[in-house]
Amino acid sequence: MYKQAVILLLMLFTASVSAALPARYMQTIENAAVWAQIGDKMVTVGNIRAGQIIAVEPTAASYYAFNFGFGKGFIDKGHLEPVQGRQKVEDGLGDLNKPLSNQNLVTWKDTPVYNAPSAGSAPFGVLADNLRYPILHKLKDRLNQTWYQIRIGDRLAYISALDAQPDNGLSVLTYHHILRDEENTRFRHTSTTTSVRAFNNQMAWLRDRGYATLSMVQLEGYVKNKINLPARAVVITFDDGLKSVSRYAYPVLKQYGMKATAFIVTSRIKRHPQKWNPKSLQFMSVSELNEIRDVFDFQSHTHFLHRVDGYRRPILLSRSEHNILFDFARSRRALAQFNPHVWYLSYPFGGFNDNAVKAANDAGFHLAVTTMKGKVKPGDNPLLLKRLYILRTDSLETMSRLVSNQPQG
């Protein structure tokens, strides 16, 4: 724990130090553990074998920093020495300077890394399980086996496709309303209403299997290839801002140490809490929103645009870009009392058109989510992101299939 705390402090200084002191290649003199920040946590991300060359950046403490995925890794200085003789990093095709491919691999076990795309090659080291790591290229060896080319410590390395999987995207889960079974007499057949029992079981399932719950900021980093995230991760979202979220979802999420995002219809925020009535759709008050801020991040679900017209179509689809932009701006102002960084939007009823997308961009939203079914992948249009529903009647096996690394529709 002490070592990880030191590394966390180092991350605050690495950028400025490395700008002044250029990276240099050094060689490991023994097998060395490496650390990096993955999501919210500083964890051991693998090891590098003795005799391997990597480019490191000097730091002010007893660790070197080096490029690891979309961030920095750290290695004890005592494991390295200046490169001896004429050894050099192989890069005959200039792959080190090529852009990344918008694709990651995921590790589900300790995964061997090699110096060349061949199982007979000298081992470089190991990547730990539960990582997403960016891929430069996919290659075929002479036996027609697929290899992933990666960049680590400003050098090339290779992972067999037999040892890792392609990253099929992050699951953004969508919820709305939650009720206890015995009080749910009006919304039992409404697909957007789940039960407290089902929600608790789903969150317990995620917790027991080591899933991290990500913020929208982290999702943005994933889409834009700027952050290292774990393989087992989901984003939990609630649309509308219903009172049942604070009454039922919040205690469950807090119990399991999870975080979530609530997309709020700001015109429906109440000045004072309403008396609980499970037979109506009630919305959270100012005080109720403040009480759940330690778990929930509040983002926009528009101000007055969460309505339908006479044909049951989202009213947003008939509004001008100017009117939509005005509403988006009003929603952001209303949420500023809870969150100074209102950067994310959920389109009402999942409806959008060119006017809505342009207004979202002009309003300053970094990401916007829809109700289109599927997972989010690096390089996706940030203002047209997909999500997944898990229904009250869905089994845990269905949930497992949705959040696992299987492709979705």
Curated annotation (Swiss-Prot):
It comes from the Bacteria. Residues 232-409 form the NodB homology domain. InterPro entries: Glyco_hydro/deAcase_b/a-brl, NODB_dom, Polysacch_Deacetylase. Pfam families: Polysacc_deac_1. GO terms for biological process: carbohydrate metabolic process. Keywords: Signal. Residues 1-19 form the signal peptide. SUPFAM superfamilies: Glycoside hydrolase/deacetylase. GO terms for molecular function: hydrolase activity; hydrolase activity, acting on carbon-nitrogen (but not peptide) bonds. The keyword Signal applies. This is Uncharacterized protein YadE. The gene is yadE.
